[in-house]
UniProtKB/Swiss-Prot annotation:
UniProt keyword list: Ribonucleoprotein, Ribosomal protein, RNA-binding, rRNA-binding
Stated family: Belongs to the universal ribosomal protein uL18 family.
Any one cellular-component term (Gene Ontology): cytosolic large ribosomal subunit
Underlying gene: rplR
Signal peptide: none
Subunit annotation: Part of the 50S ribosomal subunit; part of the 5S rRNA/L5/L18/L25 subcomplex. Contacts the 5S and 23S rRNAs.
Classification via InterPro entries: Ribosomal_uL18_bac-type, Ribosomal_uL18_bac/euk
Annotated function: This is one of the proteins that bind and probably mediate the attachment of the 5S RNA into the large ribosomal subunit, where it forms part of the central protuberance.
Source species: Mesorhizobium japonicum (strain LMG 29417 / CECT 9101 / MAFF 303099) (Mesorhizobium loti (strain MAFF 303099))
Classification via Gene3D superfamilies: 3.30.420.100
Protein name as catalogued: Large ribosomal subunit protein uL18
BP GO terms, sorted: translation
Annotated GO MF terms: 5S rRNA binding; structural constituent of ribosome
Coiled coil stretches, renumbered: none
Length: 119
């Protein structure tokens, strides 16, 4: 089994567990690359993205040193919490995908919790 296949299997395993516990709550999905981090609040029942944020946004790009550190992830966490709250979402299910809960993923999650999202 190659790296790509094992990554996809890990992500599917996490999402399967999320579907069991989610109920009606939307999913806070994280995607991480070596240079940036992206996050979306997704309503799986309707198939719509409620809110999204990334380190590629123009207003954030100038204020961040890089898009690939924990400070950038924390800024994105606060931003997604603000946007989700504005859209009327208070409770979400955290979808870390194939990434372990450590470093940038953990910083994003903690900042989103501080911003008002509960999961």
């Amino acid at each position: 089994m190659g790296t790509k296949e094992s990554t996809q299997r890990r992500a599917q395993r996490v999402r399967r567990q999320i579907r069991k516990v989610a109920g009606e709550r939307p999913r806070l999905s994280v995607h991480r690359t070596s240079k940036n981090i992206y996050v979306q609040v997704i309503d799986d029942a309707k198939g719509h993205t409620i809110a999204a944020a990334s380190t590629l946004e123009k207003d954030l790009k100038g204020s961040l040193k890089t898009g690939a550190d924990t400070a950038a992830a924390a800024a994105i966490g606060k931003l997604i919490a603000e946007r989700a709250t504005k859209a009327g979402v208070k409770e979400v299910v955290f979808d870390r995908g194939p990434y372990i809960y450590h470093g940038r993923v953990k910083a994003l999650a903690e900042a989103a919790r501080e911003g008002g999202l509960s999961f």
